[in-house]
Regions:
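Short hydrophobic alpha-helices and adjacent helix-cap/hinge residues
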Residues: 1-209
Length: 209
């Protein structure tokens, strides 16, 4: 019988790894869209940087996909790594030294846990940044494009409930978190001297003023 802890761990693993092909396909769509939105927002940008946690097992896949997206938009891409809060200041100094004009933050739970620090650093450098989840934007980040973490938590809760009621994990159907949100923070945009186009604003699911 599964314990509550092992049940939760299984649910997280299943939601994250429902199939490498499905996950990679969704990841490719999200990453491609993020760099496209960033390019639309900062039209003159030629140098972009991706901030990653190299201990995340999906970092190589994300980086490979993003290199392809950058090439298609005629952008030069750099990758900067940080595995701890202590490395953040040095990472942003490197980002600045690379003459980065726009930044993407990787979809990583450690980075997400430090979102207020990352947002503060990005804003202190007046660096247009797109993040993977809306929580960054409510913390003052410029914009985000990615799945709803609230919906992801709901799916985990549904799986947990079914298993605790006796369902076999192997027989449960795989469900994907399909809700994707594009969120913009106009206050941050104004502080950075950026103006979103009317069409881009119209595509946003939420605009924070």
């Amino acid at each position: 019988m599964m314990t509550t802890r092992s049940c939760a761990e299984w649910c997280v693993e299943r939601c994250q790894n429902a199939g490498q092909y499905a996950r990679t396909a969704l990841q490719a769509q999200l990453i491609a869209k993020r760099i496209e939105l960033l390019s639309e927002t900062v039209r003159k940008a030629q140098i972009v940087t991706l901030l990653v946690n190299p201990t995340n097992r999906y970092t190589d896949t994300e980086t490979e996909i993003l290199y392809g997206g950058a090439r298609s938009l005629n952008l030069q891409l750099h990758v900067v790594r940080a595995t701890s809060v202590a490395e953040f200041d040095a990472a942003f100094k490197e980002i600045k030294d690379l003459r980065t004009e726009a930044l993407l933050v990787s979809a990583d739970l450690f980075l997400h846990s430090q979102r207020e620090k990352l947002v503060s650093l990005a804003n202190s450098y007046a660096l247009p940044t797109i993040y993977p989840w809306r929580e960054y934007v409510t913390a003052g980040g410029l914009m985000s494009y990615g799945p709803s973490l609230i919906d992801a938590s709901r799916l985990i809760g549904i799986y947990s409930g079914k298993i605790l009621r006796g369902a076999s994990p192997a027989e449960l159907p795989v469900e994907q978190n399909t809700k994707v949100e594009f969120v913009i923070n106009l206050k941050t945009a104004k502080a950075q001297g950026l103006a979103f186009s009317i069409p881009l604003l119209g595509r946003a699911d939420e605009v924070i003023e």
